Amino acid sequence: MQQKLFIVTGHVQSVGFRFFTLQEAGKIGIKGYVKNRPEGSVEVVAVGSDAQMAAFRNWLQKGPPTSVVCNLIEQSYQGSEQFEHFEIRR
């Protein structure tokens, strides 16, 4: 299983990005969370298999039709939290 931290920049807040990300994570089987960051980006922590992560990464690069993704930063997630599902955090 891979554990990744993604930072998504662009026009990604107030456009339903978190809701659509929640839906897509559910379809793919990703666990973790999505939340808005104070500076206007969106943070996503994702846990899944190689195939699940590849599909989720591809989706995050495009985002929902209501958003404009300018950049996707990907890092290994160093946290110790165990995720049972995918959720929106505030």
Swiss-Prot record:
It catalyses: an acyl phosphate + H2O = a carboxylate + phosphate + H(+). The keyword Hydrolase applies. Keywords: Hydrolase. Pfam families: Acylphosphatase. SUPFAM superfamilies: Acylphosphatase/BLUF domain-like (SSF54975). It is an enzyme of class 3 (hydrolase). Coiled coil: none annotated. The active site is at R18, N36. Its EC number is 3.6.1.7. One of its GO terms (molecular function) is acylphosphatase activity. Residues 3-90 form the Acylphosphatase-like domain. The keyword Transcription does not apply. PANTHER family: ACYLPHOSPHATASE. Belongs to the acylphosphatase family. This is Acylphosphatase. It comes from Actinobacillus pleuropneumoniae serotype 5b (strain L20). The lineage of its organism: Bacteria, Pseudomonadati, Pseudomonadota, Gammaproteobacteria, Pasteurellales.
